[in-house]
Amino acid sequence: HLALLLILENQASGRRLRGSARAQDPVVSRVWHKEEVEESESSRGQDFDKRRFWEKDDPTGEHVSVRHEHLEKSHIRFKEDSIDDSGSAGGLNPSKGHLRLKRHDAMEELVSVEDQALANGADPGKSNMQRV
């Protein structure tokens, strides 16, 4: 696990040199690191992820980025589904990708102990929306 973290740090620092302006934004920095975790799981679709999450001019861009952290586990788990769905539209519509992932919220509650703890007994179907 430690080795994986070192690899991620090296990748992240290399990227921040090429995109220092983006890395200065706290939200982008957080998502940037999360994206590294996804790429270590599967390099498939990384260009799609970048297009979706770096559309900073889109009003929903930041909202999608924040949800991305909550949905990190299920996003990796359902990566193929997400790409097949949203990728067909070129991956350029953050809202579509957001809605596609949102459909998996209930499943995420089942597989993630962390999310169950954060929900504090709330309706699992609504807990993610409440935390956004």
From Swiss-Prot:
Tell me the keywords, alphabetical order: Cleavage on pair of basic residues, Secreted, Signal
* Region (Disordered) residue spans: 33-104, 113-132
> Propeptide residues, per UniProt?
104-132
Q: Where is the composition biased (Basic and acidic residues)?
A: 33-81
* Disulfide pattern: none
Q: What is its main location?
A: secreted
Family designation: To the SVP-1/-3/-4 precursor, particularly in regions where protein processing must occur.
Q: Any further remarks?
A: SVP-2 is one of the 4 major secretory proteins, secreted by the guinea pig seminal vesicle epithelium (sve).
What name appears for this protein in its UniProt entry? Seminal vesicle protein SVP-2
